[in-house]
């Protein structure tokens, strides 16, 4: 499916943690619904303004009932600084969904015990993945590592079997997995989006 380019409207642009924002927008194109692991490009500045490229941001959550998409992003440069300035009712350019994402039906047909592992802002697309896995009948175990305090973890508790998160320089996601390892886990297929 080809990506759509629409003008999206901001509902909220909340500070979640230092330099971390949760942007909620209305996505008017229901024919181009995103799924886990896909991303959009976001642009809140003119075509003749810097930076030259739009910012690719993964889908944190898609809510088809309200036609809203949430983007969890880190403010690290000029483009994301401009996105962080967006306020309620602001309009901006949103193009997507793009990328292959995760093939949830294939994953749940092959694996009955699944661990979702991530770190820092790389956990952003894992919420939609966890939701889709749970909706397909497999509640995964979630293991995340963060440089500083964990964020957005409460929302996982309702849809995951087990949720473990750690922080600090000595707690990468793999180490958290070893400490909180659930019985029955073994190495399996990994995915990237």
PLM regions and their residue ranges:
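Ferredoxin-reductase
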Residues: 1-88
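FNR/FR-type flavoprotein reductase catalytic core
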Residues: 78-193
């Amino acid at each position: 499916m080809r990506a759509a380019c629409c003008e999206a409207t901001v509902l909220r642009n909340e500070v979640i943690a230092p330099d971390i924002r949760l942007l909620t927008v209305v996505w008017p194109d229901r024919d181009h619904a995103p799924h886990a692991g896909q991303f959009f490009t976001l642009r809140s500045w003119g075509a003749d303004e810097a930076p030259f490229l739009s910012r690719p941001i993964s889908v944190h959550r898609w809510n088809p009932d309200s036609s809203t998409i949430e983007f969890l992003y880190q403010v690290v440069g000029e483009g994301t600084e401009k996105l962080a300035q967006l306020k309620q009712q602001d309009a901006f350019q949103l193009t997507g969904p793009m990328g292959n994402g995760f093939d949830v039906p294939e994953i749940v047909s092959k694996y009955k015990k699944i661990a979702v592992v991530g770190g820092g802002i790389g956990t952003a697309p894992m919420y939609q993945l966890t939701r889709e896995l749970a909706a397909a009948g497999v509640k995964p175990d979630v293991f995340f590592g963060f440089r500083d305090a964990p964020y957005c973890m409460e929302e996982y508790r309702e849809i995951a079997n087990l949720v473990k998160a750690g922080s600090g320089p000595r707690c990468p996601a793999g180490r958290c997995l070893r400490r909180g390892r659930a019985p029955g886990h073994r190495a399996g297929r990994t995915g990237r989006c």
